[in-house]
């Protein structure tokens, strides 16, 4: 699909998905190393990225470019990934 044939709504959602994917990659890198809770800098970066994405989603929803339910689904996916990371780190500590 070319840029010309994509609607603004599709472009907005694609950009939000790309930003969400970057955050997921950040989470997965930390899962590979299981270092997240010991690293306050990482946690600060992740919190900032999540907050920024939530603001992007809110802006796109307010413009009518993205449905609120779709934006919530993106954030929910990130929350699940983050929860998985916390569980993995907790299991590592118990061992």
UniProtKB/Swiss-Prot annotation:
Disulfide bonds: none
InterPro entries for the chain: UPF0358 (IPR009983), UPF0358_sf (IPR036270)
Domain of life of the source: Bacteria
Similarity comment: family membership: Belongs to the UPF0358 family.
Stated name of the protein: UPF0358 protein GK1077
Organism in which the protein naturally occurs: Geobacillus kaustophilus (strain HTA426)
Lineage: Bacteria, Bacillati, Bacillota, Bacilli, Bacillales
